[in-house]
């Protein structure tokens, strides 16, 4: 384990040693004219690397995307968000233009529906909506009290010897056998008290 650590450190040192200083004027537009090493510190007597970016980011208020410059942020806003200002934007990350619009009235919504599906359906739906509003949004049907009463009146589900629920509406095989004519007498097993089902 120590040998592998030593080899990895040795490889890093070797890679650092191969990064030799660039010769003066070796590349066109070389900012290091005196042959300084890239990233050298000023304390070594060499000129520092010119800083292109100060490390701060500008975040988009809508989608929180980071940008290095204000110009890039403005271009992003124009392209992706339609150049909306921070005050004009709503909450959330959506970019849809319809979401920020005010809610349409019921009449406008029904008019739009009418153009799509036909006047008869919309008129009927409008009447139903009016009736629901008059009734206090209570849809026709059973009340909660009535539903609770029906649940209470349900018979208790019997369980058979295997732990499965026995359906009450379907007669057992023995009951079906008893319903046939001439089969109303007890079977020999039942006479002995053995509850064997047919």
Curated annotation (Swiss-Prot):
Name the record gives this protein: Host transcription reprogramming factor 1
Transmembrane segments: none
Disordered, as annotated region: 21-59, 71-198
Function: Secreted effector that translocates into the nuclei of host cells to reprogram the expression of immunity-associated genes by binding to effector binding elements (EBEs) in rice. Binds the 5'-CAATCTTC-3' EBE of promoters from targeted rice genes and probably recruits a yet to be determined host repressor. Causes ambivalent immunity with increased susceptibility to the hemibiotrophic pathogens Magnaporthe oryzae and Xanthomonas oryzae pv. oryzae, but enhances resistance to Cochliobolus miyabeanus, a necrotrophic pathogen.
Disruption phenotype: Does not affect vegetative growth, conidiation, conidial germination, nor appressorium formation, but leads to significantly reduced virulence to rice.
Gene: HTR1
Cellular component annotations (GO), alphabetically ordered: cytoplasm; extracellular region; host cell nucleus; hyphal membrane
PROSITE patterns registered for this protein in UniProt: ZINC_FINGER_C2H2_1, ZINC_FINGER_C2H2_2
Comp. bias intervals (Basic and acidic residues): 71-80, 104-128, 167-177
Residues in C2H2-type zinc fingers: 58-81
Keyword line: Host nucleus, Metal-binding, Repressor, Secreted, Signal, Transcription, Transcription regulation, Virulence, Zinc, Zinc-finger
Organism: Pyricularia oryzae (strain 70-15 / ATCC MYA-4617 / FGSC 8958) (Rice blast fungus)
Cellular location(s): Secreted; Host nucleus
Superkingdom field: Eukaryota
Transcription regulation recorded as keyword: yes
